[in-house]
């Protein structure tokens, strides 16, 4: 396995000096959004079915990170394969043994998105575009912070999640003490005492952040939760994931939504 990881890192280090890829296969929806924002749409030939491509985009949607198939991947003839940070090492090794160049995205952390952006910018020779996007993700933090708990697919975003920088830009922080994503637990939520709660529903559409009457009603019926100030004062909001909340450049628009939320928060 050591030779595989050394080969992977060597490629990532040298990729900026190589010819840019002409056929990219992406197993990461967040990376796909970043490629689009970098201006590399025409180079994308294969993605997952969850990737935020326009309906008319010619790329095949055959990349499946949960059940990958090498023969199907090779049919797309990629010269670069982008794998998510949670990719099975054995799958990455199979790709390398088949002669495919790969990039493995960063392990999740507060700076993982900007590091991925820099890496993908170098790989596609779109360094200037990557620098411009990073400048938007690196905007100074707003005054605050107030605490906002993000709940998504039964998990709560902690201070080590990739969402932390965009929360800071809007003057928020996670009320949790540690972790990337923590399983939703009502007692832990009560202990965290968030100033507001944002529920993200996994849907392909991008929607604004708005007050959620259904989530408000749900939380008001839970004995250990209904006494929270954020519940009593109706500071319960919801949005859809779309492409804006994925770990990629789409977070620039998520940051704008959070900034608007901070203006109306009671």
What are these regions, as identified by a protein language model?
Residues 49-53, 59, 159-182:
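Alpha-helical, coiled-coil/dimerization segments enriched in small aliphatic residues
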Residues 22-38, 126-172, 239, 244:
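Basic- and aromatic-lined ligand-binding clefts that recognize polyanionic substrates
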Residues 70-78, 98, 185-193:
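Short helices/loops that flank or line small-molecule/ion binding pockets
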Residues 7-17:
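Hydrophobic h-region of N-terminal signal peptides that target proteins for export
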Residues 91-92, 96-119:
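Flexible loop/hinge segments that line or gate small-molecule binding clefts
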Residues 22-86:
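A short, structured surface patch at a secondary-structure boundary
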Residues 28, 85-86, 179, 196, ...:
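Short secondary-structure boundary segments
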Residues 22-23, 110-125, 131, 205-266:
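Structured C-terminal subdomain patch of bacterial secreted/periplasmic proteins
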């Amino acid at each position: 396995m050591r030779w595989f990881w050394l080969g992977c890192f060597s490629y990532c280090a040298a990729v900026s000096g190589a010819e840019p890829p002409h056929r990219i296969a992406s197993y990461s929806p967040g990376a796909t959004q970043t490629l689009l924002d970098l201006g590399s749409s025409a180079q994308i030939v294969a993605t997952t079915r969850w990737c935020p491509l326009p309906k008319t985009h010619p790329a095949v949607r055959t990349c499946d990170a949960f059940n990958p198939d090498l023969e199907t991947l090779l049919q797309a003839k990629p010269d670069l394969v982008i794998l998510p940070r949670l990719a099975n090492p054995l799958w990455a090794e199979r790709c390398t043994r088949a002669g495919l160049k790969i990039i493995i995205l960063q392990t999740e952390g507060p700076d993982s998105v900007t590091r991925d952006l820099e890496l993908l910018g170098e790989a596609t020779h779109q360094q200037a575009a990557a620098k411009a996007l990073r400048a938007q993700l690196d905007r100074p933090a707003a005054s605050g912070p107030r605490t906002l708990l993000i709940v998504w697919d039964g998990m709560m975003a902690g201070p080590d999640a990739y969402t932390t920088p965009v929360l800071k830009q809007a003057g928020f922080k996670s009320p949790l003490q540690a972790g990337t994503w923590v399983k939703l637990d009502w007692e832990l939520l009560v202990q965290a005492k968030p100033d507001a709660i944002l529920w993200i529903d996994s849907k392909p559409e991008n929607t604004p952040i708005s007050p959620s009457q259904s989530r408000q009603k749900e939380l008001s019926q839970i004995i250990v939760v209904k006494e929270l100030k954020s519940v009593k004062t109706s500071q319960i909001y919801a949005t859809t994931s779309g492409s804006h909340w994925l770990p990629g450049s789409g977070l620039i628009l998520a940051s704008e939504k959070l900034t608007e939320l901070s203006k109306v928060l009671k």
